[in-house]
Amino acid sequence: NNNSSVFKLSDLKNKFSGQTALIIAAGPSLNENLDKIKANRDKFVIFAVNKVLRVLSANEIVPDFTVCLDASSINSTLTGLEEFCAKTNCIMDIKSDSVLFTKNFKRMFMSFSKNDMVVKKLADYNKLECYESGGTATALALVAAVKLGFSKIIFTGLDMAFQNEVIYSTGEVMNKVSDTQMIVGKTQKKIVKVKSVTGDLVYTREDYAAFIQHFETLIKDLECKEIYNTTSFGAAIEGMKNVSFDELPLFFSSTGTPFIPVSYTHLRAHETRH
């Protein structure tokens, strides 16, 4: 059954002007920051990719928006979390798995990606707001945060690299079969090295390395000025300032732009359905 109301993501355009977004991606460094996120929950509007919802549920952190893009594997990441989903809003793409409508999200916000031919044709007739599709939930979250008007965007768990061979905050370990190959599920993936925020080289998957480049282009295209990455070991991403989570409040006050308390309250996660 679907009790969710469905809206266009563009309905929220610039509604969060001047506020701070925290985008939670699924990398292992997320685990270092869970307690800090909890302690500072009122400082951010939280966007979480669907893969981290189980980790957040276990830690009682309710995101304001859950961002879902995978066309196929969404169901397994959300199974059994329907009660938790009812507390959060969903941002999905027109191509996302329709199983999302059965997950009892509070509200659904639909994004129409620009590089989908069908959507392009529709948009010509319909003037739908089409957004750059990132191809991943993390990129969709970034695009959404920019369109919604956030002036600061902070990432946690955006590692795009392995930490002692751990791939995700959920604890999955990479199955390395050689210096250049690993197995993911049943697929063999090429491993490459990329520059880390520490200046060293770190191992990552070849498709992640390509995603890093895509992400850098997206940051340029979206003209994002204040994007922060709190990873302690992950890939260096051009256009993002690397700041540890603990340094964020100090960092903002020293630049004369302190955290603005979150407003636009009717969309907040902990507000219940009426």
What is each of the regions a protein language model found here?
Residues 135, 183-234:
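Polyanion-binding loop/helix "lid" in catalytic or ligand-binding cores
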Residues 52-56, 60-70, 148-169:
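Glycine-rich phosphate/pyrophosphate-binding loops
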Residues 50-54, 92-98, 231-235:
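Short, polar loop motifs at secondary-structure junctions
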Residues 1, 57-148, 219:
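Acidic/Gly/His-enriched mid-domain segments of enzyme catalytic cores or analogous surface patches
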Residues 69-71, 83-86, 171-187, 248-253:
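Acidic, Ser/Thr-rich peripheral helices and adjacent loops at domain boundaries
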Residues 1-16:
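Flexible inter-domain linker/hinge segments
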Residues 265-272:
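Conserved small/polar residues in nucleotide/adenosyl-binding loops
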Residues 239-251:
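Terminal amphipathic helices with adjacent charged low-complexity linkers/tails
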